[in-house]
Amino acid sequence: HQGVVALFDEDDGRLLCLMNAGPITARRTAAVSALSVALLARQDSRILAILGAGIQARAHLEAVAPTRGFSEIWLGARHPGPAQSMAERDPRCHLSPSFEAAVTMADVVVCCTDADSPVVAHQWLRPGCHVVSVGSGAELDADTVAGSK
């Protein structure tokens, strides 16, 4: 996705700056996701799964990981190189062999993919799992969406 953020002078409306919207959007989106985890996820949530390894996934690792006392963070990604770079940011991070493996052990699942088909199946989710989906509309299967509260 491409975008820009324009900053204008509040007094006279002059354009002060044009910025790449990617990093700003990633941080804003991750902040809202972190708020949802802080307010809605079970208090005893200890295992976080992040699916994806792009700019949104990196921002979500930074924003969501501090919201709970996560003892483990599992990273699921189609491309292991970027996921490995993410894992090096936090000693709690582990690379998962699959999306399913990451999801089945998680109390909180954050989906940040551009998948064109589901990467989360309802039957993989533990009871009470909090799911955040910020990527494509296809990340979650229909049963996960229908079963959400």
Question: Where are the predicted features?
Answer:
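NAD(P)-binding Rossmann-fold cofactor-contacting core
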Residues: 66-90
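Short helix-loop-beta connector
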Residues: 40-47, 69, 126-127
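Short acidic low-complexity segments
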Residues: 91-106, 122
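Phosphate/diphosphate ligand-binding glycine-rich loop within oxidoreductases
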Residues: 1-45
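Short glycine-/small-residue-rich Rossmann-like dinucleotide-binding loops
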Residues: 113-115, 135-136
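N-terminal Rossmann-fold NAD(P) dinucleotide-binding loop
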Residues: 57-58
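Rossmann-fold NAD(P)-binding glycine/threonine-rich loop
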Residues: 125-129, 134-149
